[in-house]
Amino acid sequence: MTGQIVKDNKKRRLRQTIASFSKFAKAAFFVVLAFFVIGACTIGGFDAPGKAYRAVPDTAGSTDTVVFYLDNQDGKGLDEIWINIGSIYTAAGSDTTVTFNYASVPSTSASTISWSSVNRIGSKTFGNIYSSSGKGITGANYNWVRFADLENAENKTTALSTSYRLIKMEAGAEMLVNEVVFVDAAGKIIPAYVTMEEAKAAYGSGWDSRPALGDAFRVNPKDAVNLLDSQHSVRKGDSTYSNFTQDEAYSLMQIDNIFLGRQFYEGSVYEIDADSGPLSSLFMSLGVLVFGKSPFGLRIVPLLFATALVALAYFFGKELFGSDAFGLLFAGLFAAGGLTLTVGRLGLSFAMTAFCVLLSYYFMYKFCAKGISADHPVKTALTVLFSGIAFAFAFALDAKAVIAAAGVVVLFIVGAVRQHRAQAAEERALREEMSESNLKAPSEEIMKVNLAEYEEKSSALAAQSAYKNKLAYLFFFASFVLATVIVTLLSSLASYFSYVKFYEANPEKPVLGIFTIVWYALRDCFTVSNVTSYTSANASNAFGWLIGLKGATLLSATEGSSYLALNAQMNTAVMLTALVGFLFMTVYAILYLATGGKNGAYATEYSPRILRAYAVFALGLVTSLLSYAFSANASAMHSLLFTVFYIGFIPLAFYTAYVHDKSGATSVLGIKMNATVKVLFALLIVYAVVFVLMLPMTFCFPLHATAAKYCFGWTTFVNNGFYRI
């Protein structure tokens, strides 16, 4: 009975808690939930290759060789070979050759295996990330490539005879091969073996009488078994659901670099994810450790941060506007109108960095607007500490955050100045109170008592003010300086050996200290160095983000009349409204200041809140834009953080219009609306229409080329050659 009462009380408290939230807060919860569910269902599959085999040629110019034994159990010959190659340790854009050959089981008198001189399987050239020569396969890293298709009616070729049970793979450079899968003419996976024990068991009697057979498998590297440890992981398809983008290959490459550690092969080039900080790969490696090197595994952590970013937009909007409704508007527009559904769902650092930067702004704004409470000084000063810790993580994720977070420092300075002014005002109030009391004092003794009380209160106020100021400056230094150094150095430890192999002239004999190495890595974050086959086509000055000058293509598999691509671009209607909102609010701020400030014609009770919100969005917009303004390879893909602040001008403009709207409310579909709300709802309908039209390029699903042209081809002013065809 007692247990039932406790359970009923818990249910009642839960219902009361839910009932205490406004309808807009509940709607915001469902927006965030819907964003995560849609993202989780579309970021990609779970199929992942197992552990990687590290192919290392014996000497420069030689090849690494692995021999497979195929157990053609159903009497069907080899038709297809699928291969998943991870990191290729050559310069980005260079080509590397991989060759497969075949042979029959050698006779008892043969001393060597006679590999086919005709070799119907042949060789393929793989570009590392992309092929600068155009001769290699571009975008192959970490994606599945059908290496061979032997039974082909169009070419009039047939599957390989079952008498050819030995397959040799040769790699022309150091690389990580994640998996190799052999498929017969019936579409079934052929069991394959690389160890002598397994191959011998599959072959049966007569193995020992064929010394050449045993010799071939005896020299196979021990970790060659990793090539066959996840045979049902082949992902077929051209969209991002099945494939990684070339930009994501750098993320996976850096994760592999961490696991590779100090292993080094002379002549290899160990590329790194130079555009992101060391913490980025650590965060994403968590998903890879749990779900493997699958699209879901790499992208789940950035998706979680993107989801948290949408939630933070709601809370920040609520704090800025003092309204759940406008907080919901901010979160909804950002979730569906920005880049969160494209860039935010990929295995890149942008969503993680944007969340930490915005979180830093959020806490520092609370300090700037409210200061430090005299009743709870430590508790309220924690906003400075939390802001700095958020910045520390942002910096370790991407050093360019130091530019984007410059606005946070401005907010701190403004908050500190306001706090000093408030303290000075309290001191003046005490002095005036004492002066007034002395004017009315009937005797000199009472005046001395008043003076003593004033000195006591003034001394207490000075001590209290000094304590609050020390807390603010201490927490600022501890978090923005010490925490940043600590988080950055600690997160760099995992990537240390990859940095050594990238920056040292001779990695076997390093001469650079850890601080120098880390400094080089952080320095390189300020340039866009992760080059792909789309980089030059996507490149656009960051100031072009203001008008959506050029969209960025992250993956394109367009063929014939079928258009298939993932493009990063703001909702055009949202972008244009944000531009109008930015200009409108800038004019408002100028007129407010030009006409006398708080005593001028534009001053109202809402002005302080409006101007504080404008300052936050303007600071964030300018600093996030400047983060990439001087990077030659910057593109719309890099504008995720920028869109957070840019979109913020839409709810700010409508909030400003709404609180000053004197028009009477009329009923529309049973909802009371004034003129401002009617305009907003009309725009939301336009946003929704454009959003639907952009769905194919947002979620990368195929569409007829003509339909793509009219649906979203017009959403970029400058065509990069992939965005529209």
Describe each region flagged by the PLM.
Residues 293-296, 313-336, 355, 375-378:
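Transmembrane-helix signature of polytopic, membrane-embedded enzymes
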Residues 220-272, 279, 523-525, 529:
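Extracytosolic helix-loop segments that constitute the early lumenal/periplasmic catalytic or substrate-binding loops
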Residues 2-31, 37-67, 237-239, 410, ...:
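Transmembrane helical bundles and short interhelical boundary loops of multi-pass, membrane-embedded
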